[in-house]
Amino acid sequence: MSMEDYDFLFKIVLIGNAGVGKTCLVRRFTQGLFPPGQGATIGVDFMIKTVEINGEKVKLQIWDTAGQERFRSITQSYYRSANALILTYDITCEESFRCLPEWLREIEQYASNKVITVLVGNKIDLAERREVSQQRAEEFSEAQDMYYLETSAKESDNVEKLFLDLACRLISEARQNTLVNNVSSPLPGEGKSISYLTCCNFN
Amino acid sequence: MADSLPTEFDVVIVGTGLPESILAAACSRSGQRVLHVDSKSYYGGNWASFSFSGLLSWLKDYQQICIDGEESTVKWPDLIHETEEAITLRKKDETIQHMEIFCYVSQDLDDNVEEIGALQKNLSTVASSTLTEPLDSACLVKDKRSVYVTKYKMPAKDTLKSDRETSLEVNDIEETLEKENDCGDKTRVHTDGDKDEKPVEDNMDQPKRNRITYSQILKEGRRFNIDLVSKLLYSQGLLIDLLIKSNVSRYAEFKNVTRILTFWEGKVEQVPCSRADVFNSKELTMVEKRMLMKFFTFCTDFEQHPDEYEAFKQRPFSDYLKTKKLTPSLQHFVLHSIAMTSESSCTTIDGLKATKNFLQCLGWFGNTPFLFPLYGQGEISQCFCRMCAVFGGIYCLRRKVQCLVVDKESGRCNAVIDHLGQRIHAKNFIVEDSYLSEETCSSVQYKQISRAVLITDQSILKTDSDQQISVLIVPPVEPGTFAVRVTELCSSTMTCMKDTYLVHLTCSSSKTAREDLESVVKKLFTPYAEIEINKEEHSKPRLLWALYFNMRDSSGISRSSYNGLPSNVYVCSGPDCGVGNEHAVKQAETLFREIFPSEEFCPSPPNPEDIILDGNDKQPEVPGTKNVLMAEVEP
Ligand SMILES: Cc1cc2nc3c(=O)[nH]c(=O)nc-3n(C[C@H](O)[C@H](O)[C@H](O)COP(=O)(O)OP(=O)(O)OC[C@H]3O[C@@H](n4cnc5c(N)ncnc54)[C@H](O)[C@@H]3O)c2cc1C
Ligand SMILES: Nc1nc2c(ncn2[C@@H]2O[C@H](COP(=O)(O)OP(=O)(O)O)[C@@H](O)[C@H]2O)c(=O)[nH]1
Ligand SMILES: [Mg+2]
């Protein structure tokens, strides 16, 4: 690992109802584009973007649902070693907001309890069709102790801010962790990943 | 969420167990349009893992009487054309039997338990004494299921407080830090100054026994990931190969099994299985050490010395071992814990092969030939499902299939009808055994697996470290019964709460699970009691909670035993009884090659890091960044 050219690596996972713009947010941030039409990018497990924060290279590994949210069938393993969760709803879709408690239940069940959760209301470019007021969302996120932000993947509003703020927060959490533990604590991958690399290291 | 399913696919797969999930990944990976459904609300079928409350709900579901197609809005007969006929599928899974639950810990009511999604306390009303009667299975059904707690807590680090002292973690394996556990490293520091924090126990010879109650188990219920089927991964086995080759390994994390144990003369002992182990063993005499080393050395290239075993080749391995100047306890080690064979059945040549295999599997990831997936076996099938979804496969749990629709003329299946009456077309269909109707399976002879799941308070073999993962084979006592495999998991495997162990017992059934396994449970454990009565029993770990059940073993059933299945309907079996997952992998690969003879089976997907992103602000990825350890922070 010492050859890696980054100081931190974090796994960020997106969840929320289908159609709220998760894939668009990821692609806006990592590729700088708003994909025309729908459809998942076949074969892409996660996207990577390395950002620099105060002179430190932070590699963000951003995981999308692979469409499994469509019929409420996300695998638990998807949540397992996430450092941060972006819980997304669509401000023009009341239903996507009303489903948030269900998503929180999944988080509670399967994610690490050290995970940082951000609530994102997407599609603010469609303000005229807004169904969920900012105030309601703020109250909800406060009650749940989550950070809250409104974005537009289409207009690129707040998308950078979302990921960069998250990265900052993750760094400070990780710092705190290592200070407190006085050991280089891998977070949260407590097990071994298996790969050919590991195999060759033995015997 | 009123999203309806697409209706055209290449492959429809019913059941999300391991073989079906591997197949789903393989099909999707090779460009097939896959629909993967399960009638349950969870992944994995009989390969699933559950939180404690999840397990209780699962048990409850099995005890309910079949509610006949309640949800079906449209019955299939109305949807079948004249040129077609239907093969109905089973409405209710019947692969689990003889469930018996025992709760040994007190179910005190002072704790205000509040676990989200959990069945609340006083679920079962078992006496907390040592005299435990099997819980009448009907008991559970009568229980009131309290309302789900609908308050959501922020998953913040301090929501739950460590309410016990932290035991010393003297550990010789690298990564036993429980980062995710509430009582883990971080919180530990937080609570250091707490008044209720008791002093750290530093006398390892007399480990402190915690008082654990049923409500604590319920409260910490989500810490549990209880496997229905208990398996391990051979470090050189087919599943590891497949995980690595297909890159599915990136979705999971593993720990090494740290010890192989043996039950010898009424005592649990560690089997020295590496050279270092043999040297360091305190149980072995110098002479024994030398004998064992010599034997191991011989086994690693036994083929080169045919003269040494030729005469015994087809005779029992146990007889052969008697000639090798090994003491009886060493013979026992080699036979049961290393070759993992049962006395009667194993020939010398197979025993030597197994021993050699064992020795070769050592040292790849650690000191034993086995790996265990964090969060339980149930993760593995889900990982393959994720891979399938990444390549466009569509997932739908809670979707029941009423019937397969067969075209009379061609004799081929061309669609399924789901419980909403929706007709879904495909070219090939893969169905897990438990979904097939009694009629289809009327001439099938099933075996059974006997299972026990125990929650205990201490390890069956205490050492400095309380974070051991151990495997113990208890040989059969009576003829006609089978060896029992015991797997003991510590909390850092993310399968049980802190200060407990999750113990799985597995054997081929000769009777009900309890009849098959209770004697082994009694040998190794003592029921939990508030006051220690019997001093002698003191050293045994205590049983807090136990579950017995039988699971159908549908492995090794030939396809021709099923009645009247069209040629494009393929059957996957449920879990087999073996330690490893080889059966599932072989089955998936065999079926895949049958359906798509010219396609490659689960090739490596492109590395996401190699997908160069367009756009002006991209950061070029440095080559050679493959095999990144997931989410590892390098400060
Ligand atoms: C270090 C070590 C590595 C092993 N690796 C494997 C392995 O990768 N896969 C595995 O299945 N077993 C492996 N075995 C053998 C395995 O531990 C036991 O033979 C098997 O679990 C016996 O279980 P049983 O008596 O319940 O099943 P059985 O009824 O004896 O066999 C169950 C099924 O497992 C298959 N099987 C048995 N032994 C092997 C083997 N050596 N290799 C491949 N298939 C086998 C058989 O075809 C059969 O279908 C290994 C043993 C050791 C000691
Ligand atoms: N107007 C607008 N449309 C958006 C925005 N983000 C996504 N969409 C559209 O919403 C639809 C669903 O987006 P997608 O990213 O696939 O959602 P996902 O299912 O959550 O991944 C697509 O048609 C997008 O074009 C946004 O910020 N503004
Ligand atoms: Mg999407």
From Swiss-Prot, chain A:
Please provide an example of a Pfam family that matches this protein in its UniProt record: Ras
Any one Gene Ontology BP term? Golgi organization
- Annotated region Switch-I: where? 36-44
User: Mutating residue 68 to L leads to what result?
Assistant: Constitutively active (GTP-bound) mutant. Increased colocalization with group A Streptococcus-containing autophagosome-like vacuoles
Which Gene Ontology CC terms are recorded? cis-Golgi network; Golgi cisterna; Golgi membrane; Golgi stack; intracellular membrane-bounded organelle; trans-Golgi network
Pro-sequence positions in this chain? Answer: 201-203
The UniProt annotation puts the region (Switch-II) at 67-83
Domain remark from Swiss-Prot or TrEMBL: Switch I, switch II and the interswitch regions are characteristic of Rab GTPases and mediate the interactions with Rab downstream effectors. The switch regions undergo conformational changes upon nucleotide binding which drive interaction with specific sets of effector proteins, with most effectors only binding to GTP-bound Rab.
What this protein is called in its record is Ras-related protein Rab-30
- Origin species, per record, is Homo sapiens
The top of its lineage is: Eukaryota, Metazoa, Chordata, Craniata, Vertebrata
